[in-house]
């Protein structure tokens, strides 16, 4: 008669726990969390926001069934030099952003840290331009500082 796989005594708790630990590595979510793979591959390095310099303005075509050009900017992050694309939310918001401006970007809020709605492949959005809120600039409450 073959031996049993798991101990089942009064003091077998530690052994059962160690045995369970081995199998957790086959769970992808556990593995990614423990090895901190998201932070390692994330351009923001796990931070909620990041500062960067605008390299160029671009227009991205919306996904089907929508049509239109979504205005975005290519931003080089100051902390690690990585280049990411960030969406400019708001009507005419792109007009307040020029090349070589300093912007603050954050996640766009899509599912699982991905892109949002009909904007393909863009995971970040611009929040501030030269330390002034982009929302305030678009609404006309504040003016962009002249350098």
Swiss-Prot record:
InterPro entries: NA-bd_OB-fold, Ribosomal_uS12, Ribosomal_uS12_arc, Ribosomal_uS12_euk/arc. It holds the Pfam family Ribosom_S12_S23. GO terms for molecular function: rRNA binding; structural constituent of ribosome. The keyword rRNA-binding applies. GO terms for cellular component: small ribosomal subunit. Keywords: Ribonucleoprotein, Ribosomal protein, RNA-binding, rRNA-binding. One of its GO terms (biological process) is translation. Part of the 30S ribosomal subunit. Belongs to the universal ribosomal protein uS12 family. With S4 and S5 plays an important role in translational accuracy. Located at the interface of the 30S and 50S subunits. HAMAP family: Ribosomal_uS12_A. This is Small ribosomal subunit protein uS12. It comes from Pyrococcus abyssi (strain GE5 / Orsay).
């Amino acid at each position: 008669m073959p031996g049993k796989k798991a101990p089942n005594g009064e003091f077998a708790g530690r052994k059962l726990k160690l045995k369970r630990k081995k199998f957790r590595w086959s769970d992808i979510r556990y593995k990614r969390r423990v090895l901190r793979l998201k932070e390692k591959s994330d351009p923001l390095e796990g931070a909620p926001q990041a500062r960067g310099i605008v390299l160029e303005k671009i227009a991205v075509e919306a996904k089907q069934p929508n049509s239109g050009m979504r205005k975005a900017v290519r931003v080089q992050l100051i902390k690690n030099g990585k280049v990411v694309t960030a969406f400019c939310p708001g009507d005419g918001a792109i007009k307040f952003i020029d090349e070589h401006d300093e912007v603050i970007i954050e996640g766009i809020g899509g599912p699982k840290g991905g892109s949002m709605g009909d904007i393909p492949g863009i995971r970040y959005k611009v929040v501030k331009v030269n330390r002034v809120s982009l929302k305030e600039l678009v609404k006309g409450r504040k003016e962009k500082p002249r350098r």
